[in-house]
Curated annotation (Swiss-Prot):
Recorded name of the encoding gene: pth
EC supergroup of this enzyme: hydrolase
Name this polypeptide is given: Peptidyl-tRNA hydrolase
Keywords: Cytoplasm, Hydrolase
InterPro entries named in the record: Pep_tRNA_hydro_II_dom_sf, Pept_tRNA_hydro_arch, PTH2
Organism per entry: Thermoplasma acidophilum (strain ATCC 25905 / DSM 1728 / JCM 9062 / NBRC 15155 / AMRC-C165)
Compartmental location: Cytoplasm
Transmembrane segment boundaries: none
Amino acid sequence: MVKKMVIAVRKDLDMGKGKIAAQVAHAAVTCAIRSMKINRDVFNEWYDEGQRKIVVKVNDLDEIMEIKRMADSMGIVNEIVQDRGYTQVEPGTITCIGLGPDEEEKLDKITGKYKLL
């Protein structure tokens, strides 16, 4: 089964492109490290398949938290990213969530309705 990672980014924060790129990178790295530690086989499959990553946009914090609830209930690795607040957003602002890597079909049940960033 195809594995992928999905990162959902809040569009209500009006972050610049560079800021979004950094936040997505934080999510991808932390999810990958966590996956390596708790499910090495899934991580290795994802890595060997080319480390597929999809970035989608969500409206606000409520949608991020709903994604987290669903991922937790399905046992999917997920990581919330909170910004340090040095540049564009306040300290502690949740900017995005990373999911996976995991089976594409499982992640699509959670994030399939969101548009690509």
